[in-house]
């Protein structure tokens, strides 16, 4: 048993050291979970060689970290990774009990240690959503021979003033999605965005969408 565990640990170290360079494996985020799965011998097969016999078990073992850590066990699709880098993908969620007064108190004045507080106009925050709305409206009109249009009571009609701002907080270091959610809840944030390179953004109560779509974590940019 001891020999098997030692072999798995050695395999883990070799795997992480090689894949972190070739496939941008996030060792800081994935090492613990990948180690557990390798020690249990749940991720030993190689899909690249046509053997995916362990893929389901490995996916279940990594759970919510599968998408971020599958490259550490050689199971990600290289083509999809190159087409959509981790910094271009993110997970967002609304928090159930935001505390706007707490979030404002923590983000006014000097920024909390190891964070970046960023304030952006709502127009900038909503730019992508606005472009998407215009595209969908055009598509809708085309499909209906320009006889109907999407209703204009969209979210943007209420936010055309330039004085409204959206405040977000980035953490300097890479964190897991669970930590990101916990940190943002403890700050009183209303939402969070967790980029798939492990950069965390807490989103304030004035933000209408999900904050900025740019990675700005000082020590977690790639």
Curated annotation (Swiss-Prot):
GO biological process annotation, one example: embryonic hemopoiesis
Stored InterPro entries: Tsg (IPR006761)
A single GO cellular-component term on record: extracellular space
Keyword match Signal: yes
Glycan attachment residues as annotated in the record: 51, 145-146
Tissue: Expressed uniformly in early embryos.
Principal cellular location given in the protein's record: secreted
The entry's keywords: Developmental protein, Glycoprotein, Secreted, Signal
Role of this protein: Involved in dorsal-ventral patterning. Appears to function predominantly as a ventralizing factor, through its actions as a BMP signaling agonist, acting through both chd-dependent and chd-independent mechanisms. May also antagonize BMP signaling, probably via formation of ternary complexes with chd and BMPs, resulting in dorsalization.
Protein name according to UniProt: Twisted gastrulation protein homolog 1-B
């Amino acid at each position: 048993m001891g020999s098997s565990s030692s072999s798995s640990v050695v395999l883990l170290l070799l795997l992480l050291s090689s894949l972190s360079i070739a496939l941008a494996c996030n060792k800081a985020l994935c090492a613990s979970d990948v180690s557990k799965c390798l020690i249990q011998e749940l991720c030993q097969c190689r899909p690249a060689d046509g053997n995916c016999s362990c893929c389901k078990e490995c996916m279940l073992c990594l759970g919510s970290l599968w998408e971020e850590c599958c490259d550490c066990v050689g199971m990600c699709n290289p083509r999809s990774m190159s087409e959509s880098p981790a910094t271009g993908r993110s997970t967002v969620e609304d928090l159930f009990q935001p505390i706007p007064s707490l979030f404002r108190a923590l983000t006014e004045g000097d920024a909390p240690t190891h964070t970046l507080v960023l304030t952006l106009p709502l127009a900038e925050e909503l730019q992508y959503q606005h472009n998407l709305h215009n595209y969908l409206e055009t598509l809708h009109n085309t499909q209906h021979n320009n006889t109907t249009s999407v209703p204009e009571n969209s979210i943007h009609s209420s936010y055309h003033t330039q004085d409204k701002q959206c405040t977000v907080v980035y953490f300097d270091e890479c964190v897991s999605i669970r930590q990101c959610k916990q940190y943002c809840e403890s700050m009183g944030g209303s939402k969070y965005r967790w980029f798939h390179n492990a950069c965390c953004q807490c989103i304030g109560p004035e933000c209408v969408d999900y904050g900025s779509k740019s990675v700005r974590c000082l020590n977690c940019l790639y």
